Swiss-Prot record:
Protein name: Putative transposase for insertion sequence element IS986/IS6110
Domain Integrase catalytic: residue ranges: 101-268
PANTHER family reported for this sequence: TRANSPOSASE INSF FOR INSERTION SEQUENCE IS3B-RELATED (PTHR46889), TRANSPOSASE INSO FOR INSERTION SEQUENCE ELEMENT IS911B-RELATED (PTHR46889:SF4)
Keyword tRNA-binding belongs to the record: no
Endpoints of the signal sequence: none
An individual GO BP term: transposition
Keyword Nucleotide-binding: no
Organism: Mycobacterium tuberculosis (strain ATCC 25618 / H37Rv)
CC annotations in GO: plasma membrane
Phylogenetic classification of the source organism: Bacteria, Bacillati, Actinomycetota, Actinomycetes, Mycobacteriales
GO molecular function: DNA binding
Keywords: DNA recombination, DNA-binding, Transposable element, Transposition
Amino acid sequence: MPIAPSTYYDHINREPSRRELRDGELKEHISRVHAANYGVYGARKVWLTLNREGIEVARCTVERLMTKLGLSGTTRGKARRTTIADPATARPADLVQRRFGPPAPNRLWVADLTYVSTWAGFAYVAFVTDAYARRILGWRVASTMATSMVLDAIEQAIWTRQQEGVLDLKDVIHHTDRGSQYTSIRFSERLAEAGIQPSVGAVGSSYDNALAETINGLYKTELIKPGKPWRSIEDVELATARWVDWFNHRRLYQYCGDVPPVELEAAYYAQRQRPAAG
């Protein structure tokens, strides 16, 4: 059916509706939030972030506009094993038994390492994470998978807590798998010196160090895979520093009640300082 010229020109010259204007504004905010969070947020986290910023919008609206913009979240892939056990080295007992939900910070730290392929060779990355709020306390990027790398990561974790006034670490369990770096004499002596209790799960069982492997998986999915190709170990180190800062301070973590890890820790300490009711 032919359309009259006047009808066509009326359509293209009409003022945009209130919904169209609102959609245009929201598209800008949605694109900004998605880009600022490494492009990993799906509709739910974009919606939560907008509402945290005071931009009230329905989740279904965010879903509709993200579809129009061609934006989506990411899905974590399967982790690969990196640590290599030393069968000749004695190992501590497993004090965790797959219980990764401690009641407070500084009760359980989990650690693991992974690797990143670069044009200059492999970069090895070690993380130490407090299991209470999934906060990364220490990390290290190195060109070799040596004991010194995991020592540097635990030193940073200890330093992080010391800067916050936590000097007594006797309640901390440090849990890893049977990787030779974590069962070495040097590493074991450093844990003992700090008063930290060592705990070791099994190699080959992802469940025995599931939380640490989750952190590695998020790191690979959110930073490493989208950032390929990596030119140098230094590039990986700089990008990792930025990602850890975002992860701890801005990334909404569902386990934490959709707040960043540092916010959950702060809420824990604020609750303890609050006078008892009654």
